[in-house]
Amino acid sequence: MLFAEIFGYRIPMKAVILAGGRGTRLSEETQFKPKPLVEACGHPLIWHIMQNYALYGITDFVVLAGYKGQQIREYFANFWLNQADVTFDLSTPNREIHKVRSLPWKVTVIDTGVDTNTGGRLGRLKNSITEDFLLTYGDGVSDVNIQELISAHNRSENIATLTAIQPQARFGALKLNGNQVENFQEKPDGEGAWVNGGFLVLSPRIFSYLIEDKTSLEIDALPRIASEGKLGVYKHSGFWQPVDTIRDLQRLEEEIAKGSLPWV
């Protein structure tokens, strides 16, 4: 059962997924497919990401595609065809898909170009999003509590609220002051440093910081917003696994196999 059904709420918010990068560090897989379609225990990363959102009633998705984006379109176009028994009537164009459990999801796939940076990809939505929305990356899986993330954002007047986590010391760190991000650090101080976990709530005001295709959300926009005191934080202590390497993928599959993630 959905958490949204248990607690009696539905969140009419879009979830935007950045899915256009080349994923070069995972070239064993990404030479053949975009990274969001790399499979973990029989389902692509993007499926796992969307399932966690759906637990909280988030079912309106916008996928910002780029590298091998046609494969993402084909995945959703054939979503049920590849997951159920099917009967083809070769005398007609008809087909019958059997025993399908419907999903109340709406998925929009937008081509944002192969070499466009993250801020440029997001900037494509400037004229179509007028309310706060969710954003994440198509290569990181987490059981982050979306309701709590949204609530943290709504309690503030911030332009953006990001999810901070404490992984092993391999990522650039955040300098926090209470529930605000002060700045970004290239190298963390060691174990226990907070980093950007890649699950965000954004105000439409973000679009004024996304000037051109080469704008980086992480390097250009978010540090500027932090310097203005408008970048909030929600601290997540649960599961979080980015997938940049084969070993990362193995770690994710090990966690899925335990049955500890709420959507599997």
Model-predicted segments: where are they?
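Structural beta-sheet core signal
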Residues: 17, 63, 135, 160-163, ...
